Swiss-Prot record:
PROSITE patterns: FRATAXIN_1 (PS01344), FRATAXIN_2 (PS50810)
Role noted for this protein: Involved in iron-sulfur (Fe-S) cluster assembly. May act as a regulator of Fe-S biogenesis.
Species of origin: Bordetella petrii (strain ATCC BAA-461 / DSM 12804 / CCUG 43448)
GO cellular component: cytosol
Gene name per UniProt: cyaY
Database matches in SUPFAM superfamilies: Frataxin/Nqo15-like
GO molecular function, one term: ferric iron binding
Protein name: Iron-sulfur cluster assembly protein CyaY
Length: 109
């Protein structure tokens, strides 16, 4: 995939995550703040947990930084897969954000 295609795909992913986080605040009373600067999305939860999702265009990866560690995801045409064999991006973010929110939340991509 070209860099332009990758950046467009990442933009859609970050928009979707941000929109879902806003929905959690409205429908599940999750205390969360979102901020976006270019291809960096930061989620801040009531307990002070920060989750940062950003793109690395040169590697064509999405990186996630959370209390539990740093994770890298590469797109295979259908899914964002952990480069170390862990859960796919939506599953990992669902778990990370659920722990920070104190209630189950789901990320769907």
């Amino acid at each position: 995939m070209t860099e332009t295609e990758f950046l467009a795909l990442v933009d859609q992913v970050l928009d979707s995550i941000e929109s879902q986080a806003d929905d959690w605040a409205a429908s599940q009373d999750v205390d969360i703040e979102t901020s976006r600067s270019g291809n960096v999305l930061t989620l801040v939860f009531e307990d002070g947990t920060h989750v940062v999702v950003n793109s690395q265009a040169a590697m064509q990866e999405i990186w996630v930084a959370a209390r539990s560690g740093g994770f890298h995801y590469r797109y295979d045409g259908q899914h964002w897969n952990d480069t170390r064999g862990g859960p796919r991006l939506p599953d990992a973010l669902s778990q990370i954000c659920s722990e920070a929110a104190g209630v189950p939340v789901a990320v769907r991509l």
